[in-house]
Each structure stands twice: as C-alpha cells, then as structure tokens.
C-alpha cells in the first residue's frame, strides 16, 4: 500500500470541500485492510508494518475530518509555511473583530445571553471561514491567502475553547 499524502491514501481528491461520508467510508476500507488483527499470525515485521499503516490511516482521518486541520494540511502540502507560532500578522479588520470578541468573552463570563450570543457569532465565523477556504483553495488555488485564513480560524477555535471553559456565573 503506497500513498504520498492523506488524500491519496483514501483515494480522494485533494480538496478542502470533502464529503464526510465518503471520507469515513474510505477510512473504514483502509483501516479494515491494515487492521493489526488481520496480521495476528504474520511475522513480527509484517505486524509492525500493519500497525504503522493503521496509525497512519487514523492520523490521516483525524486531520481530514476536521475542516480546520484539513485546510492547514492542504496549505502545508502546497508548501505554505503557516508559521503559527511566529507569524501573528493579520488583517486589521480581523484584529478589530478579535478585540470585540475578547470584550464579548468578558461579558459572557457573567451573562448567559452574552455567552449564547458569542457562541452563535463564533459558529457563524466558522461557517464563513469554511466558505472562504473552499473558495481560496478549491476554486482559486490561493494557498498563501488560505494560510492567512487558517491562522485566523485558529484564533476563532482558541476563543471558542475559552468560551466553553467560561460558563457564565448565574
């Protein structure tokens, strides 16, 4: 079994827009072929290779089923260094939005209505990110700009995690 990337491992096109049902079916087919139990009576080397393929299939599935990780993977495969730790440069409008969301997060800690409003706003931001990334990657092939959007999406996800941890005080 040879596959150069996660998409070819599952026989899927390298696209951001991906049918989750097709992805799961492809993963199940690959996982069934390389499941270590199928190699219980094989040599130690064959069992080790099966285990490595199973781990690879599981990791590929984990990355491809998460839209943000899939976008990140596609950008990296296209040679874009996302510099997630060092590159904090973002669009000024998005920076202003970040500040607004941070203020809303402070309110959300005290107010259930503010909590619900911010959660809904972040969900809308996720949907917009997915639409934008589908256009940038699948339609325009603009991986550099897609990388910028992935960094923005990472901020949205981090804020969503903080929101989940910040249940409003009743």
Swiss-Prot record:
Keywords: Chaperone. PROSITE patterns: DNAJ_2 (PS50076). GO terms for molecular function: ATPase activator activity; protein-folding chaperone binding. GO terms for cellular component: iron-sulfur cluster transfer complex. Signal peptide: none annotated. Interacts with HscA and stimulates its ATPase activity. Co-chaperone involved in the maturation of iron-sulfur cluster-containing proteins. Seems to help targeting proteins to be folded toward HscA. This is Co-chaperone protein HscB homolog. It comes from Bordetella parapertussis (strain 12822 / ATCC BAA-587 / NCTC 13253). The lineage of its organism: Bacteria, Pseudomonadati, Pseudomonadota, Betaproteobacteria, Burkholderiales.
């Amino acid at each position: 079994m040879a596959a150069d990337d996660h998409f070819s491992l599952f026989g899927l096109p390298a696209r951001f827009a991906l049918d989750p049902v097709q992805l799961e079916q492809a993963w199940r087919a690959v996982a069934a072929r390389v499941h270590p139990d199928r190699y219980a009576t094989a040599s130690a080397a064959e069992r080790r290779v099966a285990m490595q393929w199973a781990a690879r299939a599981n990791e590929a599935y984990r990355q491809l089923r998460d839209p943000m990780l899939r976008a990140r993977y596609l950008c990296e495969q296209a040679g874009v260094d996302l510099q997630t730790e060092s590159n904090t440069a973002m669009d000024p409008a998005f920076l202003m939005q970040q500040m607004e969301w941070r203020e809303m997060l402070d309110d959300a800690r005290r107010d259930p209505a503010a909590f619900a409003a911010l959660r809904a706003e972040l969900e809308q931001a996720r949907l917009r990110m997915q639409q934008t990334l589908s256009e940038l990657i699948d339609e325009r092939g603009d991986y550099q700009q897609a990388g910028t959007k992935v960094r923005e999406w990472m901020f949205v996800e981090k804020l969503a995690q903080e929101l989940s941890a910040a249940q409003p005080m009743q």
